[in-house]
Amino acid sequence: MTQTWNLLQAGQERNYKVAYINARIIDPETKLDIEGSLLTEGSKIIDFGESLFSNGVPSGVDETINCEGLVLMPGLVDIHVHFREPGQEHKETIYTGSKSAAAGGVTTVVCQPNTTPAIDSVILAKYLKYRALETSHVNIEFYAKITTSEEKLTEVALLKEAGAVGFTDDGIPVMNPMIMRQALLYSSMLNVPIAQHAEDLNLSAGGAINEGKISEALGVKGILSASESVMVSRDILLMKDIENVHYHILHISSKDSLDAVKRAKDLGLNVTCEVTPHHFTLTEDIVKQHGAIAKMNPPLRTEEDRLAMVEGLKTGVIDCIATDHAPHDRSSKDLPLESAAFGIVGLETMLPLSLELYHSGQIDLFDILAKLTYKPADIIHVPRGRVQKNFVADLTLVDLNYEWEIKIDSFASKSKNSPFGGRKVKGRVVRTIVSGKTVYSQK
């Protein structure tokens, strides 16, 4: 297998035309599913259809890509990644993280602000944007911090003007309810999501894995499931009387939290949530096998919780899938459970793990792809994740039925902390296109 990457930088040349022929073209939003061809010019999708190029590709096309046996679909959108820049470049950088994203078919990511220093000022926001323009393979968006040192609100309006698509203190929760209430009021004024790492630290402090049979068997302090659902319930109460507010829950993991979200949605509240592939594929049981490699926050929970996540994806209570891509070097993970860092990498496994729900007949393909493309894009109000005329040409070419084994040593990410090594999956990214430009391909 030969893999090739290209930096995005300015994107495709303005008038450069690419014809994608013999493709199965899927757009989850419009329920489009056809056999046909698609034409891009520069950064845009110009045309597509079953009869396009039926008389052959015209001479004015610069490049023709035969997609026989492959699915051409919107580029994936991951609204929860940690690229560790600035401050922890030994774990990941925008360059290596975006390379990992491209290999996973992800064309847009949202970087979390818990870097060193944190993205809590306009200067740091501008620095991040500059680094992204210089070194990224994919579109880089970012959340800015809700608070400065967890004590007071950041300059939320100025940070939005500087490019922030939302606000979070991810890695830790906003514990102070008055500060959270103020942030939610800004959400209403500025039309941005306030994204909460839902965890009451009074119920979780010092915990390493889910509180339950595995934590008891291993003799380590557990993280109570209620630490998440209590915070979710608190925040829903804080936002319920604010008009035009958007509250988003990061990496939801417990059945009780999901029940609270469903109740809020039934009341018409603008509450959205994301789930990671590891929370709908794995349980706390694998900690016995993988140790600290399977340590993340929120932790892997029970089979009942896992099944609730799958059901939430089926019913639409869960709005999207996101990785919480959290790279760590070996020295951060080769430690006892209590001392090791939280988190796993996920960009290169998100698509095949999500497709397990399709291949097993649990969830419709349109529904899975929707939660990987336009639905996360809509949460952050970014016009991505669609195959439609005159839309930006962010595309992923996938062999839907290709069977392969996950090999973590081959990841493009600088870090290899994943419990999925050796897992057999179906669905492989063949090519990733951002703004009409191929940024990743493999043969």
Swiss-Prot record:
Biological process GO terms, please? 'de novo' UMP biosynthetic process; purine nucleobase catabolic process
| Active site location | 324
Superkingdom per UniProt: Bacteria
What enzyme class is recorded for this protein? hydrolase
- Alphabetized CDD domains for the sequence: DHOase_IIa (cd01317)
The cross-references to HAMAP family, in alphabetical order and at most eight, read:
PyrC_classI_B (MF_00220_B)
Q: What is the protein named?
A: Dihydroorotase
Protein species of origin: Wolbachia sp. subsp. Brugia malayi (strain TRS)
GO molecular-function annotation terms? allantoinase activity; dihydroorotase activity; zinc ion binding
Its biological purpose is as follows: Catalyzes the reversible cyclization of carbamoyl aspartate to dihydroorotate.
The UniProt entry's GO CC annotations, sorted and at most eight, read: cytoplasm
